[in-house]
């Protein structure tokens, strides 16, 4: 890897990360899915799949944050009460999948790839953990409330916020002020130009992992509508042993209310619209950072 020169990127880490991900911001601003997202058309089935993936991702991320909470390379960014999402996602899993959600939620290959990278970073390259925290938390914080309202309306969800706890940060009064604090803390992290370069590259990797996940889910849901075979569903339910209990997959709980969709929308179109929403959870939020 080519060593960056000291003056080849902004001095502040927050500015360096923003600069490094500028191309993704431009893509997000001009992408066609942004237009679809604004229509608020979201597939319930696809939304459930992504929420399950987010549960696995945040479980891994926050396990590694806890591992490194006293490590100087991350400690200034340790805000568990304000930012951590695992507990909120557990509430959402119970809403979407029922009381036995731990036994049945899917963990796709792309999700496993994402989880593996998070554990690898936390255990062997903790100085890169900031890139994943920055990409996820500030993005979610920036776009969370807007996305929550769109999802509530599109899927006729309760106004109380059930099923969407992930998008709510009850311990942050002002997202704008908190993001300013977070960036200031980021800029106190001591790192060489080479390490800073590696952190910015890892932020790009985080974006690629998200894109890989959404592309995979697009293929999976499209194929599932064509041929919903038992073997396919069994493969979908394979989960990392470190994340859930070692139990046999259970059948999906019955009795969950189903939200009807327009008969004029094909399954493929419904999924494209869902993908628009899912990508927006990264793109809209990150663009607002």
From Swiss-Prot:
It catalyses: heme b + 3 reduced [NADPH--hemoprotein reductase] + 3 O2 = biliverdin IXalpha + CO + Fe(2+) + 3 oxidized [NADPH--hemoprotein reductase] + 3 H2O + H(+). It is an enzyme of class 1 (oxidoreductase). It is a single-pass type IV membrane protein. GO terms for molecular function: heme binding; heme oxygenase (decyclizing) activity; metal ion binding; protein homodimerization activity; structural molecule activity. Residues 1-266 are cytoplasmic. InterPro entries: Haem_Oase, Haem_Oase-like, Haem_Oase-like_multi-hlx, Haem_oxygenase_CS. GO terms for biological process: cellular response to arsenic-containing substance; cellular response to cadmium ion; cellular response to cisplatin; cellular response to heat; epithelial cell apoptotic process; erythrocyte homeostasis; heme catabolic process; heme metabolic process. One of its GO terms (cellular component) is cytosol. Its main location: endoplasmic reticulum. Its EC number is 1.14.14.18. The record marks 140 as: Important for catalytic activity. The transmembrane domain is necessary for its oligomerization. This is Heme oxygenase 1.
